[in-house]
């Protein structure tokens, strides 16, 4: 009788140990069952995409499903309970049942791993399909293009380079005005009277000589520049500043140097 009582107590202790081990197994999973860390590609092409940094809804759902399945099947391969031997060469029927349960749990964990692998493959194919669809769509400018460095108005988008102007040819240049002798004599007389034309005087000359106002204005400007260059007279303000030692931009020609030598 006493031996039977001892055997019953051993079986009860074994059952309680199995239950406690099953409760601890989800916390102490094998390193092979840990969810694989998703590697992010930090290439320039990926960073410049408009959807860079956004979490995809499909990947989040897959992670949740994987966690739920791991919780349902916490046991890992190789973590089966070894049935204790209660005698020399004999084992109880409950120990055999425990070993069968561990085998079933390992099969279920392998199936769950296969399913998760299929899900990973399907998610990769979905990702490739999305990338192909995005490539067909018109390109969306990323947010960094609209910063103040590229434009004062963020809504205007990136600046576009203005096309360079073509090199001016001889045909594009304004042709020189060929004044007649009468026109030149009249312009010289007006210049001797006053070197600067008023608007009314310029309009009257244009009507009398049959010229444009711009032609008469340019002739007077060129005439003043030639006289200033020929005489070499300095401006009164320049003379005043030179007296104070604040302005002296006089240049010495080679002829002057040779004479001084």
UniProtKB/Swiss-Prot annotation:
Q: Which GO terms describe its molecular function?
A: DNA-binding transcription factor activity, RNA polymerase II-specific; RNA polymerase II cis-regulatory region sequence-specific DNA binding
Q: What is the lineage of its organism?
A: Eukaryota, Metazoa, Chordata, Craniata, Vertebrata
Which InterPro entries has this protein been placed in? Engrailed_Homeobox_TFs, HD, HD_engrailed, HD_metazoa, Homeobox-engrailed_C-terminal, Homeobox-engrailed_CS, Homeobox_CS, Homeodomain-like_sf
* Disordered: region residues: 1-24, 53-125, 152-176
Gene this chain is encoded by: eng2b
Which PANTHER family does this one have? HOMEOBOX PROTEIN ENGRAILED, HOMEOBOX PROTEIN ENGRAILED-2
Per UniProt, the keywords (alphabetical) are: Developmental protein, DNA-binding, Homeobox, Nucleus
* DNA-binding region(s) from the entry: 172-231
Give Gene Ontology CC terms: nucleus
Similarity annotation: Belongs to the engrailed homeobox family.
Pfam families, per the entry:
Engrail_1_C_sig, Homeodomain
* Record-given protein name: Homeobox protein engrailed-2b
Q: Where in the cell is it found?
A: Nucleus
A Gene Ontology annotation in the biological process aspect, one of them, is:
midbrain development
- Name the principal localization, coarsely classed: nucleus
Record field: compositional bias (Basic and acidic residues)? 1-21, 53-72, 100-116
């Amino acid at each position: 009788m006493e031996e039977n009582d001892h055997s019953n107590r051993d079986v009860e202790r074994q059952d309680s140990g199995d239950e406690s081990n099953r409760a601890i197994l989800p916390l102490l999973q094998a390193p092979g069952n840990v969810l694989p860390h998703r590697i992010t590609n930090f290439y320039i092409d990926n960073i410049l995409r408009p959807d860079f940094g956004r979490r995809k809804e499909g990947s989040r759902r897959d992670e949740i499903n994987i966690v739920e399945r791991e919780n349902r099947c916490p046991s890992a391969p190789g973590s089966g309970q070894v049935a204790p031997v209660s005698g020399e060469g004999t084992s109880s029927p409950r120990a055999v049942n425990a070993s069968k349960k561990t085998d079933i749990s390992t099969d279920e964990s392998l199936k769950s791993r296969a399913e998760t692998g299929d899900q990973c493959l399907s998610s990769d194919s979905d990702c490739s399909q999305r990338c192909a669809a995005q490539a067909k769509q018109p390109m969306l400018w990323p947010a960094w293009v609209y910063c103040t460095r590229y434009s004062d108005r963020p809504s205007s988008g990136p600046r576009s380079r203005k096309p360079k102007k073509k090199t001016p040819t001889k045909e594009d240049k304004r042709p020189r005005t060929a004044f007649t002798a009468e026109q030149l004599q009249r312009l010289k007389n007006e210049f001797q009277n006053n070197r600067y034309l008023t608007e009314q005087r310029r309009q009257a000359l244009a009507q009398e000589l049959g010229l444009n106002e711009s032609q008469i204005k340019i002739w007077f400007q060129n005439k003043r520049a030639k006289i200033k260059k020929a005489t070499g007279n300095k401006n009164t303000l320049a003379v005043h500043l030179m007296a104070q030692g604040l302005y002296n931009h006089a240049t010495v020609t080679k002829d002057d140097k040779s004479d001084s030598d």
